[in-house]
UniProtKB/Swiss-Prot annotation:
It comes from Escherichia coli (strain K12). Belongs to the gamma-glutamylcyclotransferase family. The lineage of its organism: Bacteria, Pseudomonadati, Pseudomonadota, Gammaproteobacteria, Enterobacterales. It comes from the Bacteria. One of its GO terms (molecular function) is gamma-glutamylaminecyclotransferase activity. May play a role in antibiotic biosynthesis. This is Gamma-glutamylcyclotransferase family protein YtfP.
C-alpha cells in the first residue's frame, strides 16, 4: 500500500523516523487542497490550492503506527487519493482552520518563506 505525506513525516522532517521501513516512490502534488500550519506540523484540508509532498510504499504495521499517531483524538482522517504511483492514503485535517496560518506555497518545507 502507499501513503502520501506532506509534513513532518517527509524526508528529514521531525517525524520522518516513522517512515524508516517505508520505500520512497517519489514526489507528488495534489490539487484542491490547502495546507495550514498547526505549529510543529501541518494539516491539509480541501480547498483552492495545491499541497506538495512525497509518496511512500508502506506495510500494514507502518500504517497502523501512523494511524495511532495521526488519527487519535479525531485530528486527522485517512482518505484515499490517486497518485501517479497508484492509489495512496492521505491524512486530511478534520478541525476548523479559522485563525491558522495558511502556507501559501502548499509546501511544508517552504513554510517560512
Amino acid at each position: 500500500m502507499r501513503i502520501f505525506v506532506y509534513g513532518s513525516l517527509r524526508h528529514k522532517q521531525g517525524n520522518s523516523h516513522w517512515m524508516t521501513n517505508a520505500q520512497l516512490l517519489g514526489d507528488f502534488s495534489i490539487d484542491n487542497y490547502q495546507l495550514y500550519s498547526l505549529g510543529h506540523y501541518p494539516g491539509a484540508v480541501p480547498g483552492n490550492g495545491t499541497v506538495h509532498g512525497e509518496v511512500y510504499r508502506i506495510d500494514n504495521a507502518t500504517l497502523a503506527e501512523l494511524d495511532a499517531l495521526r488519527t487519535r483524538g479525531g485530528e486527522y482522517a485517512r482518505q484515499l487519493i490517486q497518485t501517479p504511483y497508484g492509489s495512496a492514503w492521505m491524512y486530511v485535517y478534520q478541525r476548523p482552520v479559522d485563525g491558522l496560518k495558511l502556507i501559501e506555497s502548499g509546501d511544508w518545507l517552504d513554510r517560512d518563506k
